Amino acid sequence: MLTHANWQEPNINFQVDEMYRGALEVLRWSYQEYGNEIVYACSFGIEGIVLIDLISKVKPNATIVFLDTDVHFKETYETIRRVKEKYPQLNIVMKKSALTLEQQAAQYGEELWKSDPNQCCAIRKIKPLHEALSGTKAWISGLRREQSPTRQQTNFLNRDDKFKSIKVCPLIHWTWKDVWRYVSKNNLPYNPLHDQGYPSIGCEHCTKPAFTMDDLRSGRWQGSGKTECGLHE
């Protein structure tokens, strides 16, 4: 089994087919390799919807972890409800921070997402994912190379030093058009905020409509110089 501890660049030739761009083959390999020791950390954005549908074809009872920061859009929670209805066999885990918003405010001050967004992400996303990945060997992410300059070197299989894990990224060759074409063709439920200028959706306080569709993440942490929550750095 390929793990963080024994990592070497895998000599696996995944075929980038026309229909799935390699994603389905990567998922089949991943669940065969890791079984129940792999989870999908999903934000329920549009890429996440595609991956959930693909995962359901490979492992209908797969574990999907949503990092519930308690400050997501109501549309995001409604999307999760609709996904649960469509895929009742999936094990969707709502993973929260150990600190409530009230406890966080008492310890770090009100509106930490403004005063120190990195600390806020660490408390409400990074630490909870560390906890969710405890006992697993790998996790799946919806990263695409097209999303941002920081993601252009992402491979199907990546050694993740932050979480001491293998990060599997099946959608690296998918374009924005590929994603939407798949969602439309298969009539999949998705977050309606995508139709309102939000190509990338995170917490409500830190997500605005994108400045430009040339930078799909330009609506995240606007004005802060921050482009990633820390999960993929």
Curated annotation (Swiss-Prot):
Pathway: Sulfur metabolism; hydrogen sulfide biosynthesis; sulfite from sulfate
One of the Pfam families matching this protein, by short name: PAPS_reduct
Compartments reported by the entry: Cytoplasm
GO CC list: cytoplasm
One annotated GO biological process: cysteine biosynthetic process
Record note on cofactor: Binds 1 [4Fe-4S] cluster per subunit.
CDD domains: PAPS_reductase (cd23945)
Active-site residues from the entry: C229 (nucleophile)
EC numbers, comma separated: 1.8.4.10
Catalytic function, reaction form: [thioredoxin]-disulfide + sulfite + AMP + 2 H(+) = adenosine 5'-phosphosulfate + [thioredoxin]-dithiol
Positions that bind [4Fe-4S] cluster: C120, C121, C203, C206
GO molecular function, one term: phosphoadenylyl-sulfate reductase (thioredoxin) activity
Membrane-crossing segments per the record: none
Keywords for the protein's UniProt record, in alphabetical order: Cytoplasm, Iron, Iron-sulfur, Metal-binding, Oxidoreductase
Top-level EC class as recorded in UniProt: oxidoreductase
Database matches in InterPro entries: APS_reductase, PAPS/APS_Rdtase, PAPS_reduct_dom, Rossmann-like_a/b/a_fold
Cofactor section: [4Fe-4S] cluster
PANTHER family the record matches: PHOSPHOADENOSINE PHOSPHOSULFATE REDUCTASE (PTHR46509:SF1)
Stated family: Belongs to the PAPS reductase family. CysH subfamily.
Function: Catalyzes the formation of sulfite from adenosine 5'-phosphosulfate (APS) using thioredoxin as an electron donor.
Protein name: Adenosine 5'-phosphosulfate reductase
Species this chain originates from: Lysinibacillus sphaericus (strain C3-41)
Gene name in the database record: cysH
